[in-house]
Amino acid sequence: MKLLKYALLAIPFLYFSCSDDDDAPEPINEEEVITTMTVTLVNHQNGSDVVTMQTQDLDGDGPNEPVVTVSGPLSAGTSYAGSIQFLNEMEDPAEDITEEVQEEDDEHQVFFSASGVGMEFVYMDFDGDGNPLGTQFVLAPLGAGSGSLTITLVHEPTKPNDGLDTAGGSIDIQTTFSVTVE
């Protein structure tokens, strides 16, 4: 009888000592899967002069190298309206990651750098704090020559920053395109 009495007294203590005080974990915002980056450059002075640069890596981190293409040369002495589209073509239908990058503009930034040929870049889209995003930009080739253009999308960079070297974060996609300016 005593055992039953102690057992009945223990039940409320056990019940109230087991509370559900676990806070729900914050969702992890993982890096985007990007298989394709398409850069479209439209000449401000001649709308029919369109240069398309694309990198496509349909097997993701698989063994095949990405296919990198540039449709033609850039023209010196002019400027181009640039736009970038990011896709995940491992999904069917392909998922447009550009929308997610633009919605999470405070967590992304596109960086541009040229080597061997002079180019200026001007950001045309910004996050809510006025920091650059880079899916819309202006590119101005400064003179004729050949070189490379590297475009890098960084996830969760430090903003503001002084460029890719101080941005931190992790790289969602980075590609170097061979370019010619005539």
Locate predicted features.
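Sec-dependent bacterial lipoprotein signal peptides
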Residues: 1-16
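Bacterial Sec-dependent N-terminal signal peptides
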Residues: 13-38
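Extended low-complexity, serine/threonine- and proline-enriched intrinsically disordered segments
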Residues: 35-41, 101-116
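N-terminal edge beta-strand
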Residues: 48-75
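Short beta-strand segments enriched for Tyr within beta-sheet-rich domains
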Residues: 78-82
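Short acidic/polar inter-strand loop motif in beta-rich domains
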Residues: 88-96, 156-163
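Helix-rich interaction surfaces within compact, conserved domain-sized segments
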Residues: 114-171, 176-182
